[in-house]
Swiss-Prot record:
It comes from the Eukaryota. The lineage of its organism: Eukaryota, Metazoa, Chordata, Craniata, Vertebrata. This is Mitochondrial translation release factor in rescue. The keyword Mitochondrion applies. GO terms for molecular function: ribosomal large subunit binding; translation release factor activity; tRNA binding. InterPro entries: Mito_Transl_Release_Factor (IPR052405), Pep_chain_release_fac_I (IPR000352), Pep_chain_release_fac_I_sf (IPR045853). It is found in: Mitochondrion. Gene3D superfamilies: 3.30.160.20. GO terms for cellular component: mitochondrion. Residues 114-156 are annotated as: Disordered. The GGQ domain interactS with the peptidyltransferase center (PTC) of the large ribosomal subunit to trigger nascent chain hydrolysis. The gene is mtrfr.
Length: 156
């Protein structure tokens, strides 16, 4: 039996004692994704994939394993290199996600939802930083005012 509350589907299990137990939604959004944007579909025959040795810290473990994925989208010529994890499978998945995001920006340009979200995020960070700097400046002026009053009180 499935119930529908607001925007989620809940599965109901009937227990032997006759009590109904409502479980988690049967379909969950991807973990860690705060946005749902329709990204372009990438077909495997349009991709050229290579596995190369990664770079960066890690010493011998990094130097002798080829778990860095280089993915090239043949029609557009976009190249993505992913070496985020030690797992080739996870790097392959992540490289495809990055490629889809880059294709979204390349095809839609300024109309891209990802680009709009990135600009919005940067604007929020700048506003927050500006407010922090304003508060620091106010505190500095307040301390100067207190110090000058204390000096005036001492001199009189």
């Amino acid at each position: 039996m499935t119930l529908f509350f607001s925007h989620r589907l809940f599965t109901v299990w009937r227990l032997k004692c006759g009590v109904m137990d409502i479980g988690w939604p049967s379909v969950l959004p991807a973990a860690g994704k705060k946005y749902q944007i329709e990204l372009p579909v990438v077909h495997e025959e349009e991709l050229e994939e290579q596995f190369v040795r990664g770079s960066g810290p890690g010493g011998q473990a990094t130097n002798k394993t080829s778990n860095c994925v280089v993915l090239r989208h043949i029609p557009s010529g976009i190249v993505v290199k992913c070496h985020e994890t030690r797992s080739v499978d996870l790097n392959r998945k992540r490289a495809r996600e990055i490629l889809r995001e880059k294709l979204e920006v390349a095809y839609k340009g300024e109309e891209s939802e990802l680009l709009k979200m990135k600009k919005e995020s940067m604007q929020k960070k700048q506003d927050k930083r500006r407010k922090v700097n304003e508060n620091i400046e106010k505190k500095r002026r307040f301390k100067e005012m207190l110090n000058s009053k204390q000096e005036d009180d001492k001199s009189t």
